[in-house]
Amino acid sequence: MRWQELKDEACPVARAMSVIGDRWTLLVLRDCFRGVRRFEAFQERLGITRHVLADRLRKLVDAGVLSREPYQDGPVRYEYRLTETGRAFHPVLVTLMAWGEKVVPCDGETPPLRLVSRATGEPVRPVVVDEATGEPITPSNVRAER
């Protein structure tokens, strides 16, 4: 299967991967949720080439995940903001963070990045639950079907 063909697949995972399916795109989105909006800031934080960054930002704008808005005239410069579609990616990113912390923990020298509640300051542990029942969703209690 070719990369460009993923968006036409019946599988929602394949279609999602057609939008966010590489490391740079995921890291750009991570930084967006941390408040990064400007091209130079993304480039500095990620160490990514201008060409690759421009490509990933364009794809995210084209997919409706980010919007491109001018913040300066002469020369015109743009910043990138999460759209409603982009903000809907947050639970995926949070779950990926939790998985990464469990499976690929920090080296012990650098403190790990943790999610904490803005209200209490306490650590937050994400759990994927069924909206109707509030029960955790696990491989043993759900299946995919058409």
Please name every model-derived segment.
Residues G21, Q72-L93:
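Basic, amphipathic "hinge/linker" alpha-helix immediately C-terminal to the N-terminal HTH DNA-binding motif
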Residues V94, A98-R146:
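C-terminal regulatory/oligomerization modules of transcriptional regulators
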Residues M1-D8:
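A detector for short, charged/polar N-terminal pre-domain segments
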Residues L29, R37-F42, L57, V92, ...:
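Extended, folded domain segments that form the structural surfaces/walls around functional sites
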Residues A16, L26, A63, V92-V104:
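Alpha-helical linker/hinge and terminal dimerization helices associated
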Residues F39, Q43-Y71, P75:
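Canonical helix-turn-helix DNA-binding module
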Residues C11-T49:
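N-terminal helix-turn-helix DNA-binding core of bacterial DNA-binding proteins
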